[in-house]
UniProtKB/Swiss-Prot annotation:
RING-type zinc finger span: 679-714
Species: Mus musculus
Tissues expressing the protein: Widely expressed.
Motif (PTAP motif 1): 653-656
Protein's UniProt name: E3 ubiquitin-protein ligase LRSAM1
Catalysed reactions, as listed in the record: S-ubiquitinyl-[E2 ubiquitin-conjugating enzyme]-L-cysteine + [acceptor protein]-L-lysine = [E2 ubiquitin-conjugating enzyme]-L-cysteine + N(6)-ubiquitinyl-[acceptor protein]-L-lysine
GO cellular component assignments: cytoplasm; cytosol; membrane
One GO process term, biological-process aspect: protein autoubiquitination
Comment text on domains: The coiled coil domains interact with the SB domain of TSG101.
Single GO term (MF): zinc ion binding
Keyword terms, alphabetized: Autophagy, Coiled coil, Cytoplasm, Leucine-rich repeat, Metal-binding, Phosphoprotein, Protein transport, Repeat, Transferase, Transport, Ubl conjugation, Ubl conjugation pathway, Zinc, Zinc-finger
Region: Disordered, residue numbers: 227-248
LRR repeat copies, ranges: 30-51, 56-77, 82-103, 105-126, 128-150, 151-172
Taxonomic classification: Eukaryota, Metazoa, Chordata, Craniata, Vertebrata
């Protein structure tokens, strides 16, 4: 047996069954039976021991589980002291507790289909035990104390490794049925074991020197009587009393089955009510999702209004500051000009006398220099003529030598260049062949590795999923709004406006909560897509070659939803209208109800609500656009989708140019204009991280690593989210 093992976690259905059975056992007027079978238990829960001890249960049914031991830690066998029937068959028990003899009133013990290798010696203390079933275990011998079971009627030791019976079994005079593997027995001999229970008992009594009496001469206590401890030697009416006992037990078990069936019906009714409640909860959850978008739009409008007020105030302050700076600049310029003029006048007066003196000195110095230069010039020309003649001869000789060296070097270089070019061509050809071989090898490896193909298919599936794309776009929009709110909050802190600061904080908290919810929805959608991938993998043929490559190609060649709807008969202008209003998720509803532009022009907002369009602003905008389209005699150029636009109709669309304030877009533009702000820690890089749960965007990726609290609000950081600025 392994020293360490992982406990199996029960399934949801098994957990519900356990809770239901425990509740039944604790109800007022419940019977003496505790049934926790088929609950996938790895150990008996503490609550079951407490229930048996407090409510004095007499029957404990724990079959068909994963038990490896009867007693878990911190539990005592004395809690089951009132148990008369203990059913433990179809488990994984390897041994029974050594103090099993403490269950003095136990009458039925069933441990069939387990892994028992031995029985405890204390089993002989179960003086009221009448049925012992150890079938299909790994027992090799029986303890001698088995002969002390004075009330034992039925003993089943078949499908074990037992070859010898203890002689003490002859003292069990009440044994009526003994089941064993007769051919595998050594003692008693196989022919004796095959003759039946009476023959085995006669053989053991003869070996022990006892007289054999049939079990019908001994009267056993009834199962439900608590006072009897030993057998009583009385020949008065044993058969009739035994039949009455059997009938009484049959009646009790039939009543138990009826009550069990009644409880099962009650359980089904409870599950039906639970399912109804879950449906109502799903409807409420859907309504909450619609309210989220409305809240987001309201927050955005309020933020826009606040930004306009702030920008107006900022413009006033900038104008005043600029006016003041102009005045200061003019004053400084006038003062500087006056000082400059004074300095210039003073300087001219000082230098007037110095200039005259310096001019005279310069004239004298120049005359001296000119006289010296004339003499040196005459001497220098003689030397230059001699040097020029010598240089001419030297250069003519050098030029001939250089020309000869150049010719020889040019010839050698030409030869080397030819040989090196040929060698380089060979190397290039070899490198190109190696690259081609590596490329072919990589392509064949990618085609053969199903794991890489599966990962590529999963990535493409997530990329093309409409719901996942809409959640990503909403998360991107909220990140942009949080970045703008953080910048706005930093600016307003410098102005010390507490009322506006509180309003921005409330908006930021609302956006951060909405961002957390969208992250959960994104993770849930990814799990759903992963589940779909697992189903595909389970249904796929294991020997099919390139299965994931084929699935990837199918998904890649799959037409967009808008193109499918157009091929099915939906008008292109209607598809383009819904895509322009960022309502492409309503395309299946319009296609299902076969709605055209003519029908749409005659519909009211209430009719659209019945179809499934819940946003009031979007209803009015769709109806208005449809009427405008029908009023135009021909199709406008902007409503004619090109081929590439049809293929990309379900990509995140840009927002329409003219939308009423009541229209709520379901997806942000394809390219968000992400504002930039500097990190409040290093003041150098841009802020790239969103802190949850506060929602501030104030740090770069490098500075946020050691932080545990937000630098702006000092809130605990539970999660960090990276913002990727779109170029």
């Amino acid at each position: 047996m392994p020293l360490f093992f992982r406990k199996r976690k029960p399934s949801e259905e098994a957990r519900k069954r356990l809770e239901y059975q425990m509740c039944l056992a604790k109800e007022a007027g419940a019977d003496d039976i505790l049934d926790i079978s088929k609950c996938e238990l790895s150990e008996i829960p503490f609550g079951a021991f407490a229930t048996c001890k407090v409510l004095q249960k007499k029957v404990l049914i724990v079959h068909t589980n994963h038990l490896t031991s009867l007693l878990p830690k911190s539990c005592s066998l004395l809690s089951l002291v009132t148990i008369k029937v203990l059913d433990l068959h179809e488990n994984q028990l390897t041994a029974l507790p050594d103090d099993m003899g403490q269950l003095t009133v136990l009458q039925v013990l069933n441990v069939e289909r387990n892994q028992l290798t031995h029985l405890p010696r204390s089993i002989g203390n179960l003086l009221q035990l009448q049925t012992l079933n150890v079938k299909d275990n790994k027992l090799k011998e029986l303890p001698d104390t088995l002969g002390e079971l004075r009330s034992l009627r039925t003993l089943d030791i078949s499908e074990n490794e037992i070859q010898r019976l203890p002689q003490m079994l002859a003292h069990v005079r009440t044994l009526e049925t003994l089941s064993l593997n007769a051919l595998a027995m050594v003692y008693p001999p196989p022919e004796v074991c095959g003759a039946g229970t009476a023959a085995v008992q006669q053989f053991l009594c003869k070996e022990s020197g006892l007289d054999y009496y049939p079990p019908s001469q001994y009267l056993l206590p009834v199962l439900e009587q608590d006072g009897a401890e030993n057998t009583q030697d009385s020949p008065d009416g044993p058969a009739s009393r035994f039949s009455r006992e059997e009938a009484e037990w049959q009646n009790r078990f039939s009543d138990y089955e009826k009550r069990k069936e009644q409880k099962m019906l009650e359980k089904l009714e409870f599950e039906r009510r639970l399912d109804l409640g879950q449906r109502e909860h799903a409807e409420l959850l859907q309504q909450s999702h619609s309210h989220k978008d409305e809240i987001l739009q309201t927050v955005k409008q309020e933020q826009t209004r606040l930004e306009q007020d702030l920008s107006e105030r900022q413009r006033c302050l900038d104008a005043e500051r600029q006016q003041l700076q102009e005045q200061l600049k003019q004053t400084e310029q006038s003062i500087a000009s006056r000082i400059q003029r004074l300095l210039q006048d003073n300087q001219r007066q000082k230098k007037s006398s110095e200039i005259l003196k310096s001019l005279e000195n310069e004239r004298i110095r120049m005359e001296q220099l000119m006289s010296i230069t004339q003499e040196e010039t005459e001497n220098l020309r003689q030397r230059e003529i001699a040097a020029a003649m010598q240089q001419m001869l030297t250069e003519s000789c050098k030029s001939r030598l250089i020309q000869m060296a150049y010719e020889s070097q040019r010839q050698s270089l030409a030869q080397q260049a030819c040989s090196s070019m040929a060698e380089m061509d060979k190397r290039f050809q070899q490198i190109l062949s190696w690259q081609q071989m590596d490329q072919n090898k990589a392509i064949s490896q990618i085609l053969q590795e199903s794991v890489m193909q599966k990962a590529a298919f999963e990535a493409l599936q997530v990329k093309k999923d409409l719901m996942h794309r809409q959640i990503r776009n909403q998360i991107r929009l909220i990140e942009t709004e949080l970045l703008q709110l953080t910048q706005l909050e930093l600016k307003r802190k410098s102005l010390d406006t507490e009322t506006l600061q509180e309003m921005v904080s409330e908006q930021r908290w609302a956006l951060s909560n909405l961002l957390q919810q969208l992250l959960k929805e994104k993770k849930q959608r990814e799990e759903e897509l992963h589940g779909i991938l697992a189903e595909l993998e389970a249904k796929s043929e294991t020997k099919q070659e390139n299965y994931w490559l084929i699935q990837y190609q199918r998904l890649l060649n799959q037409k967009p939803l808008s193109l499918k709807l157009q091929e099915e008969g939906m008008e292109r202008r209607l598809v383009a209208l819904l895509v322009e209003l960022s309502a492409e998720h309503y395309l299946p509803l319009f296609a299902h109800h076969r709605i055209s532009l003519d029908m749409l022009s005659r519909m009211s907002p209430g009719d659209l609500a019945k179809v499934g369009v819940s946003e009031a602003g979007l209803q009015h905008e769709i109806l208005r656009r449809a009427q405008d389209l029908l009023a135009v005699p021909r199709v406008q150029p902007e409503l004619k989708p090109l081929e590439n636009e049809v293929l990309g109709a379900l990509e995140p669309p840009t927002a329409p140019r003219e939308l009423q304030e009541s229209v709520r877009p379901s997806a942000p533009p394809a390219e968000l204009d992400m504002p930039t702000s500097e990190c409040v820690v290093c003041l150098e890089r841009e802020a790239q991280m969103v802190f949850l749960t506060c929602g501030h965007v104030c740090c770069c990726q490098q500075c946020c690593q050691p932080l545990r609290t937000c630098p702006l609000c000092r809130q605990e950081i539970s999660q960090r989210l990276r913002i990727y600025h779109s170029s």
